[in-house]
């Protein structure tokens, strides 16, 4: 699975992307976030309030409850704002 990070999320994590293999216990975006938060405190800080984060699965706007698979591309980014 490829995971992409944008904007302040990328800045806080210090990386724009990473690759990982999913185990069978990871079925949703929420499950993935729980796993990532166990990696280190930077993930815990980024994902403590997911109301300020949007997610896409394979470039489709998605929800945190949506199913994910090992070959998916997941992207985390802040909500779009206009000006």
Question: Over which residues does each language-model region extend?
Answer:
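Ubiquitin-like/PB1-type beta-grasp interaction modules and other compact soluble beta-rich domains
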Residues: 1-81
């Amino acid at each position: 699975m490829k995971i992409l990070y944008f904007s302040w999320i990328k800045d806080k994590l210090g990386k724009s992307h990473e690759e990982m293999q999913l185990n069978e216990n990871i079925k949703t975006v929420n499950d993935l976030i729980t796993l990532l938060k166990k990696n280190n405190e930077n993930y815990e800080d980024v994902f403590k309030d997911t109301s300020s984060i949007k997610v896409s699965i394979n470039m489709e706007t998605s929800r945190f409850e949506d199913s994910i698979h090992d070959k998916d591309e997941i992207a985390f980014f802040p909500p779009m704002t206009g000006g």
